[in-house]
Amino acid sequence: LSGLVGSEMCIRDRARRALAKAGLCGFEQRSYNMLSGGEQQRVQFARALAQVPNPVENGEARALFLDEPTASLDIGHQIAVLETARDFASGGGLVLAILHDLNLAAEFADQLIVMHGGRVTASGPSLETISDETIARVYGIGGVVGRLPSRHIPYVLPQSRHR
């Protein structure tokens, strides 16, 4: 709760709402050190949400910065975290998330910036940014970029698995 501004009751309410959005209802009294790695990761996500509970405040868009928010999470919690971030963006806020999983990034991001060696190597809408050429250039591996048939979202598979 440290770093939050407002009355104690307001701060506790913001913290409870953030924990609920992170799927941690009832965790308020649990010691952080006793949580699993995935639970600790979701606590970190809740901390970010508690800092900016509303995507727009006083007519100005707020920003939510997330560094690997899906690390250590099972797929169900990965999706829940990224859907919550997408809801924040849909409400008028800005979400800047660092992800290493291009498949998740393609599913949840409107725009992608792909970096390699600290430099931007590709950027733009995910449909245009994720390509065989980008995968080869950034990761030095052959990949097969396909499209999920129902939604035309790109996905990446190693070549050896796609034969």
Q: Where in this protein do the model-derived segments appear?
A:
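Conserved ABC ATPase signature
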Residues: 31-35, 39
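Helical segment within the ABC ATPase nucleotide-binding domain
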Residues: 54-55, 78-91
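Catalytic Walker B motif of ABC-type/P-loop ATPase nucleotide-binding domains
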Residues: 57-59, 64-68
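H-loop/switch region of ABC-family ATPase nucleotide-binding domains
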Residues: 99-100
